[in-house]
Each structure stands twice: as structure tokens, then as C-alpha cells.
């Protein structure tokens, strides 16, 4: 084999190894967003729930500040339980429908159903809970210890 071919082969292998270490984007984020908007009939965009209280958003800690924040904590806990069962909630695509009573999971089994149930329950909980503007984008360092 020619040295140039070896260099090309080495470059391909190195680039594949590098690509393998890049984490994939969450697949079900769009599904969960759509479920939230289905449950609340489009009255509040899903991004409003991203920086709410101590648990709605990236990571949660402390005591939930209200009912809506408790919904987010329950969703986090549901994902934690799914992970214990070797499911990957943020990367599990599932099937569901939006009906007059909100989101409903299709009859799937295993991880897809588990994650779908977590998201549907949370979306319905969000729709029922009041949104307190004072708890949006709070200082989590102060309020969530």
C-alpha cells in the first residue's frame, strides 16, 4: 500500500472517531414541545416552561416553587426512572396523537411507551397548573437550594 493511501485511511479513521464522540441532539424535544402545545391548546408556547421555577429547564434542585414546578420535578423523576430501566428519554422517538383531551400515546411498549407516558403526563400537568410570571426566570442560586 502506498504511503498516501495510508494517510488517507488514517485521516478517515481519525475523523470517524471524532464524530463518534459528538453527542447526538435530543430527538424527542420537538415531540414534547408539540405535546405541551397540544395539552394547553396552544395558549402558551412550550419555551415558556424552559426557565420556570427550580425544575423546569436544564437541571433541577431544591424545593419546587409551585404546582407547575412540581410538574417539572415529576417529569424529571419520570425520566430518571426511565433511565434506570436503560431507556434514553431524550433520544426516544415515540408515536402519539393530539385529541380533544390532550396528548395520547399510541399503543407501543417498552422505552418508547415509558417516555411517551412521561411526556404526556407532564404536558397535561403543565396545562392544569397556573403559570406564575414571578416564578419565570428566577435566580435559581437563591431560590432553589
Swiss-Prot record:
Belongs to the phospholipase A2 family. Group I subfamily. D49 sub-subfamily. GO terms for cellular component: extracellular region. Disulfide bonds join 38-98, 54-144, 56-72, 71-125, 78-118, 87-111, 105-116. Ca(2+) binds at residues 55, 57, 76. Its cofactor is Ca(2+). It catalyses: a 1,2-diacyl-sn-glycero-3-phosphocholine + H2O = a 1-acyl-sn-glycero-3-phosphocholine + a fatty acid + H(+). InterPro entries: PLipase_A2 (IPR001211), PLipase_A2_Asp_AS (IPR033112), PLipase_A2_dom (IPR016090), PLipase_A2_dom_sf (IPR036444), PLipase_A2_His_AS (IPR033113). PANTHER family: PHOSPHOLIPASE A2, PHOSPHOLIPASE A2 FAMILY MEMBER. Residues 22-27 form a propeptide. GO terms for molecular function: calcium ion binding; calcium-dependent phospholipase A2 activity; phospholipid binding. Keywords: Calcium, Disulfide bond, Hydrolase, Lipid degradation, Lipid metabolism, Metal-binding, Secreted, Signal. PLA2 catalyzes the calcium-dependent hydrolysis of the 2-acyl groups in 3-sn-phosphoglycerides. Its EC number is 3.1.1.4. GO terms for biological process: arachidonate secretion; lipid catabolic process; phospholipid metabolic process. It comes from Notechis scutatus scutatus. This is Acidic phospholipase A2. It is found in: Secreted. It is an enzyme of class 3 (hydrolase). Residues 1-21 form the signal peptide. Coiled coil: none annotated. Binds 1 Ca(2+) ion. The active site is at residues 75, 119. Expressed by the venom gland. CDD domains: PLA2c. The keyword Ligase does not apply.
Amino acid at each position: 500500500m502506498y504511503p498516501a493511501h495510508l494517510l488517507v485511511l488514517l485521516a478517515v479513521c481519525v475523523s470517524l472517531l471524532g464524530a463518534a464522540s459528538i453527542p447526538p441532539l435530543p430527538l424527542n424535544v420537538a415531540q414534547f414541545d408539540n405535546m405541551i402545545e397540544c395539552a394547553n391548546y396552544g395558549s402558551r408556547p412550550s419555551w415558556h416552561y424552559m426557565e420556570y421555577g427550580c425544575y423546569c429547564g436544564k437541571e433541577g434542585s431544591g424545593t419546587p416553587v409551585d404546582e407547575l414546578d412540581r410538574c417539572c420535578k415529576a417529569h424529571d423523576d419520570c425520566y430518571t426512572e426511565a433511565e434506570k430501566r436503560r431507556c434514553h428519554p431524550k433520544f426516544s422517538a415515540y408515536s402519539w396523537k393530539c385529541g380533544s383531551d390532550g396528548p395520547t400515546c399510541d399503543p407501543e411498549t417498552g422505552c418508547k411507551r415509558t417516555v411517551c407516558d412521561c411526556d404526556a403526563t407532564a404536558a397535561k400537568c403543565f396545562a392544569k397548573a397556573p403559570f406564575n410570571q414571578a416564578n419565570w426566570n428566577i435566580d435559581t442560586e437563591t431560590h432553589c437550594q
